[in-house]
A protein has these predicted regions:
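Short hydrophobic/aromatic helix or loop-helix immediately within or flanking a transmembrane segment
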Residues: 64-70, 83-106, 313-329
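Membrane-interface micro-motifs in multi-pass membrane enzymes
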Residues: 58, 86, 90, 157-204, ...
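Membrane-proximal lumenal/periplasmic loop motifs of glycosylation machinery
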Residues: 52-60, 74-95, 108-109
């Protein structure tokens, strides 16, 4: 037999090189096994994240989104009469909530299941995106179908992609308990990273053609309608890098090749999406849909030093490595302290990958690397000078840093770490094994936490037992109580106005629920944990002296024999 590439000679013929066989296709059985393993891993991850999510009580924020999805599921697709917050999540989490509610009904479990689903998707998408770019093949020109001499979005396609995927998934594998409310609970920008990674899978894997930027622009626009944070995490970084690299290429080579036009097309599509998406709230209101609360100016340069420190801690918190948290050396269990220390390795790798990515901004090659690096820097900078940088809970505004950093680390460092593992097996393999075991143990530790009831569950149970099925309360006792009761008790949010009279709270509320012609409400949760100051006095000024008053579990519940909605000032 002739060896691969060996010349052969037939009688009467000149020597020709033997044909080189193409790469063998993976058998269907092997692909099925691989798909089964991925499905099993996804199921295990979903279960662990679902369990950890239940360790944090559901509040009115997530409950409001549950009720909005419930309204959409029952025909109010545009959320007519609804006032949403400054982020609607209309095209991101709400469709997901509708799907879960169609299968499981209305209740607190919707948020926990959705959070687990979202984070599982993020881990899997980060692994796939970190694994590698567009498959090999002859690239095409952006405007024509002509072959291009250069690969627009990346040079080469390294075969060993598993280390990259494992590293990216590993860095996200086990969110620490302190970050559960950010990463594994209500919609708070974490879920917006799912469509972001999907968009980048399209950019990274699709062959360059004119319709790819068009699809990218449409996806960015749809995502921005739901959450404008995509401006910082995807749109602005792509515009800056695309335009910057095009300008640098023009200066360096004096002409625009297919790669330059393609990246400019991506940047233009992203810029157009940013403009179009900004009109989303106004378009929805004009169509008779929800009205969105305006996004307040949140820049505060007077606390820059404090903001920088909180930003640094927030970055560590997202990666599960915040050793500067006040409870680190104190009230935390010793095991949790160990997990946080182990997660420092992941945070260090993310910072290392960020530095490598920034150094490649103007280097021809993968577009995803400099864009993700710029996105991380933009998010850190915007958060640092914002009013959100007051405490660690505000780190939800930069939750996308975790998947972005994980993808960068896997993409840029996965092969290098695999090489080190082979070269220094004696000492490097034990280090990797300890870190892997630590991350897996942290995943199990989070899943082992005891579930806690939803925030409004005790109050909802008492109200239902006493026949009080519709009433008013402060924001934090309103929608959370409604969802905790699976809709059997409906509590609408009110707030004192300048006259100390109660008026509807135009934040995550359905104005139809205040209509006295359609509903009868006869109680107010007037005092208790997180209740607006002065609620009891405002309730009596608005509705008169109550017929009965109850004091239950720290709450004061005032009851009237009349419909209090009739006296509620809805003009305010």
């Amino acid at each position: 037999m002739t060896s691969r590439g060996e010349k052969v000679q037939a009688a009467g013929l000149t020597e020709v090189p033997a044909l080189t066989p193409g790469p063998a296709r993976k058998p269907a059985a092997a692909l099925a096994v691989r798909a089964g393993l991925v499905a099993l891993a996804a199921a295990v991850l979903f279960f662990c994240y679902w369990r950890q999510s239940q360790a944090v009580p559901l509040s009115s924020d997530g409950s409001s989104n549950v009720l909005q999805a419930w309204a959409m599921l029952h025909g109010n697709l545009l959320l007519h009469n609804w006032w949403v917050s400054d982020v609607s999540f209309y095209t991101t989490e709400l469709p997901q909530y509708m799907l879960i509610e169609a299968l499981a009904g209305l209740g607190p479990w919707v948020v926990h299941a959705a959070a687990a689903m979202t984070y599982t998707l993020l881990v899997l998408l980060a692994a796939v995106l970190a694994a590698g770019g567009r498959p090999p093949g002859t690239p095409r020109s952006f405007f024509r179908g002509d072959p291009s001499p250069r690969t627009p979005l990346g040079k080469g396609y390294p075969p060993p992609r598993t280390p990259r995927a494992l590293l990216a998934a590993g860095l996200m594998l086990s969110p620490q308990l302190g970050a559960t409310s950010i990463l594994l609970l209500s919609p708070d920008h974490t879920g917006t990273a799912v469509p972001l990674l999907v968009i980048w899978l399209l950019i990274d894997r699709a062959r360059p053609h004119w319709y790819v930027p068009v699809m990218v622009g449409l996806l960015f626009t749809v995502t921005m309608v739901g959450d404008s944070i995509i401006l910082l995490t995807g749109i602005v970084p792509l515009v800056l890098v695309g335009a910057g690299r095009a300008a640098a290429g023009l200066i360096r080579r004096g002409k625009r090749d297919a790669s330059t036009w393609y990246e400019l097309g991506m940047a233009g599509a992203a810029a157009g999406a940013g403009v179009a998406g900004s009109f989303g709230p106004r378009v929805m209101a004009a169509l008779g849909g929800y009205r969105q609360s305006p996004i307040a100016a949140d820049t505060d340069l007077s606390q820059l030093q404090h903001g920088a420190w909180v930003t640094f801690q927030g970055f560590l918190e997202l990666f599960g490595a915040n050793v500067f948290k006040p409870t680190f050396f104190g009230t935390r269990p010793a095991l949790e302290v160990v997990f946080v220390a182990i997660h420092l390795a992941g945070a260090i790798l993310a910072v290392w990958a960020l530095g490598v990515g920034l150094a490649r901004i103007f280097r021809p090659g993968e577009l995803i690397v400099p864009v993700f690096a710029v996105a991380i820097v933009a998010n850190l900078g915007a958060y640092m000078i914002s009013t959100h940088a007051q405490d660690l809970l505000g780190a939800r505004e930069m939750a996308a840093l975790l998947p972005l950093g994980a993808v960068l680390a896997g993409r840029l460092l996965g092969d290098r770490i695999a090489t080190w593992t082979r070269a220094a097996r004696r000492w490097f393999v034990p280090v990797i094994s300890v870190l892997t075991a630590g991350y897996l143990a942290a995943l199990g530790f989070g899943a082992a936490q005891a579930p806690v009831p939803a925030g409004g569950e005790p109050l909802a149970g008492w109200l239902a037992a006493h026949g009080l099925t519709r009433g008013l309360a402060s924001y934090w006792q309103a929608n959370s109580t409604t969802v905790a009761s699976s809709g059997h008790v409906v509590v609408s949010a009110v707030v004192p106005d300048v006259r100390d009279h109660l008026v509807p709270y135009l934040w995550e509320s359905d104005l139809a629920s205040y209509d006295p012609a359609r509903h009868f409400a006869n109680f107010v949760v007037a005092d208790g944990p997180s209740v607006w100051p002065g609620m009891q006095l405002s309730a009596q000024l608005t509705f008169g002296h109550p017929a009965r008053a109850y004091h239950v579990d720290g709450y004061t519940i005032l009851v009237w024999n009349t419909n209090v909605l009739a006296k509620l000032d809805k003009s305010a």
